[in-house]
A protein has these predicted regions:
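Bacterial signal peptide processing site
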Residues: 21-23
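Positively charged n-region of N-terminal signal peptides that target proteins for export
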Residues: 1-5
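A surface/extracellular/periplasmic glyco- and lipid-processing/surface-interacting theme
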Residues: 25-40, 44-105, 112-371
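C-terminal motif of bacterial Sec signal peptides marking the signal peptidase cleavage site
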Residues: 16-19
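Repetitive helical segments and hydrophobic/amphipathic motifs
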Residues: 12-13
Length: 371
């Protein structure tokens, strides 16, 4: 599907000095606006349909998760996922509960400290996780992406740059009201979402626990349609072998290595395996890997920045089953899902399982290793 972009306006101006909220240091205030994008279709809109396999009765009371395509209890169908901001500084390790997340985003959180990253983890059945985190602050990029899942952002404050985004009607969030765990670390590394926290917060707020009017109907990802079906990318254009991915994140050196036995890409950082003591020390792993080349804007000299998560026809990779293909990605607005297309302009089909999505600064893209 071919489209044309018209970039109408993008304003970034320094106005005055202001402080940050919560844990963040001071930074000069600026007024920002996400580029206004008009998308003009050259071809008629194509309706996206997903073929469903016949239910033989073995999945009674279950439905396919919109996040992973796995069979999960029907009672969760209308429940909104959470998007938890997880600190990825080395001091915050080990992470708890992240290996049980459905989708994990990793993205540059600041241009300072060699481009330190932060995780945004999406979880549908959050009550199954006893302890998730540690929780840290959010950024504007997260508040642009989370609405495409109709997810509730769980964080602890953030710089004032997030204020205009938090005020948008399709952004719901809980901030700084989670459990504190005595782990021997300084206070900023002790906040976790623990059993009962979400129910307590829903009980004292007007935030809807179930999908609201901003939820986009239809599939978010295009998944394989049958239990035993696997997309091995064998017929995809430009397919190449890929058993190793090295992200150009200098601070933590994120890496994914393909494990043929489990057919997953296992995640490491800081030169060590990422294991989860909250889940029997399981190593974080993914069936699907998506990598996005992203433009960004630098807000100030303190390293605050924002990715252009709303953009069109940007480069990327889809990686699964020991193979990789070049893709292009597009996102039209906050509540519309990001779409990924192969080089024949077909929307990609993901395999059933967890997905890792990395946003890589365009000026670091050449340092990405996919081999």
């Amino acid at each position: 599907m071919k489209k044309r972009l018209v970039i109408l306006a993008a304003l970034f101006a320094t106005v005055c000095l202001a402080g940050c909220k919560g844990e963040e240091e001071q930074a000069p205030q600026i007024v920002t606006s996400e580029p206004s994008i008009q998308v003009i279709n050259d071809t008629p809109a194509i309706s996206i349909e997903q073929e469903e396999e016949a239910d033989d009765g073995s999945h009674e009371g279950m439905y396919r998760s919109e996040l992973t395509n796995e069979w999960i209890p029907e009672e969760l169908k209308d429940q909104r996922p959470i998007a938890a901001m997880v600190d990825n500084e080395k001091t915050a390790l080990p992470h708890y509960g992240v290996s049980q997340a459905d989708v994990v985003y990793e993205m540059t959180n600041s241009l300072a400290n060699d481009g330190i990253t932060r995780l945004m983890v999406l979880v549908k059945d959050y009550e199954k996780i006893d302890q998730l985190g540690s929780i840290r602050s959010t950024r504007p990029t997260n508040l642009v992406i989370a609405p495409e899942w109709n997810a509730i952002v769980c964080h602890d404050g953030g710089p004032f740059y997030i204020d205009d985004y938090l005020a948008k009607p399709f952004v719901d969030n809980f901030s700084g009201e989670f459990s504190r765990v005595d782990n021997g670390k300084s206070r900023e590394f002790t906040e976790y979402i623990c059993t009962g926290d979400m129910e307590k917060l829903f009980g004292k707020s007007n935030v809807s626990k179930t999908y609201n009017e901003y939820h986009k109907e239809g599939p978010h990802f295009q998944f394989v349609s049958k239990d035993d079906e696997i997309n091995d990318l064998s017929s995809a254009p430009g397919v190449k072998d890929c058993t190793k991915v090295e992200l150009p994140y200098k601070h933590n050196s994120s890496k994914l290595e393909y494990d043929e036995a489990t057919q997953r890409y296992l995640y490491s950082e800081y030169g060590q395996k990422h294991t989860d003591p909250g889940n029997n020390d399981e190593q974080l792993g993914f069936t699907n890997v998506l990598i996005q080349n992203c433009r960004y804007v630098k807000f100030d000299d303190n390293g605050y920045m924002m990715f252009h998560a709303i953009d069109y026809n940007r480069d990327g990779w889809y990686i699964t089953q020991g193979k990789a293909i070049h893709v292009t990605w597009s996102k039209e607005d906050e509540v519309t899902p990001t779409r990924y297309f192969d080089d024949d302009d077909n929307e990609i089909v993901l395999n059933t399982g967890k997905t890792y999505i990395a946003l890589v600064p365009d000026d670091k893209w050449s340092g990405l290793v996919v081999e």
